[in-house]
Amino acid sequence: MSKYSTIAPTERLPEWLRRPIGDASALERVQGLVKQNRLHTICEEGRCPNRGECYAAGTATFLLGGSICTRSCAFCQVEKGQAPMAVDPAEAQRVADAVEAMQLRYVVLTAVARDDLADHGAALFTTTMEAIRARNPLIAIEVLTPDFWGGCPDPQQAVAAQRERLSTVLAADPVCFNHNLETVQRLQGEVRRGATYERSLGLLAACRELAPTIPTKSGLMLGLGESRDEVIAAMRDLRAVDCQRLTLGQYLRPSLAHIPVDRYWTPEEFDELGAVARDLGFAQVRSGPLVRSSYHAAD
């Protein structure tokens, strides 16, 4: 049993967070293709409220590396465990099949953390990008990666290994590199087990250094107990490593086993924070209660 299981919700879901699922036919079609190809999407695994809208617009986010994550973040719906599936050598081709069948124009690739693999899953991204482009080289591909950290007891070796894994992904030339900070600095230990604030900022900084033509992107969830000042401080830290794109969205508790919502930020508060982010110099900002990492990613 999770330590959060006995903490009941204290507020009802506000009206602004209730929305229809969207285009039911598009949703059913994509769900059928995903099931047929034995794939995973973060849209479904994470129960994203925007998935119907995104499917209808010709975008989807595929989850690579199976459905079991080696990290145990307190907010995430994805199944967790230390014995994930063996890497499926046919996964990349099945993703490419689905992208072709869905006639997608913009694809986001993400992955569960695979701390059990020597490259921490870097090749999952590159082989899938290669398979998609073999069918249609004009498809734009964004990557949303884990931090590629671990496997080296020496800190300097760990940084070098992280940069090597990152370089592998960047060499495949995604149109955008996304790595989420997820929450403010104070809440990292509770929310992102196995990851750190500084490590994520370092990854984004390394991306700008290694591939300055590839834009970087990051996201924050609100509603975990952070203050407005802490959110702005995190945005400043992201700009300090030249992160160019930002998403801000409301955290929604997937189940009673997950960390509770502290409060629901209003649409007006999201608008105000979005304005602050633009003033700080972010080139692209998506800020709203239902915004997620890949929301309107193709815009």
UniProtKB/Swiss-Prot annotation:
E.C. designation(s): 2.8.1.8
UniProt subcellular location: Cytoplasm
One annotated GO molecular function: metal ion binding
Record-linked Pfam families: Radical_SAM (PF04055)
UniProt-annotated binding residues for [4Fe-4S] cluster 1: C43, C48, C54, S294
Gene Ontology cellular component terms for the protein in this record: cytoplasm
Domain of life (superkingdom): Bacteria
Pathway membership: Protein modification; protein lipoylation via endogenous pathway; protein N(6)-(lipoyl)lysine from octanoyl-[acyl-carrier-protein]: step 2/2
Chain sites annotated for binding [4Fe-4S] cluster 2: C69, C73, C76
PROSITE patterns, per database record: RADICAL_SAM
Cofactor, free-text remark: Binds 2 [4Fe-4S] clusters per subunit. One cluster is coordinated with 3 cysteines and an exchangeable S-adenosyl-L-methionine.
Keywords: 4Fe-4S, Cytoplasm, Iron, Iron-sulfur, Metal-binding, S-adenosyl-L-methionine, Transferase
Annotated Radical SAM core domain residues: 55-283
Cofactor(s) the record lists: [4Fe-4S] cluster
Keyword Ligase (UniProt): no
The reaction(s) this protein catalyses: [[Fe-S] cluster scaffold protein carrying a second [4Fe-4S](2+) cluster] + N(6)-octanoyl-L-lysyl-[protein] + 2 oxidized [2Fe-2S]-[ferredoxin] + 2 S-adenosyl-L-methionine + 4 H(+) = [[Fe-S] cluster scaffold protein] + N(6)-[(R)-dihydrolipoyl]-L-lysyl-[protein] + 4 Fe(3+) + 2 hydrogen sulfide + 2 5'-deoxyadenosine + 2 L-methionine + 2 reduced [2Fe-2S]-[ferredoxin]
Record family assignment: Belongs to the radical SAM superfamily. Lipoyl synthase family.
Protein name: Lipoyl synthase 2
Organism of origin: Parasynechococcus marenigrum (strain WH8102)
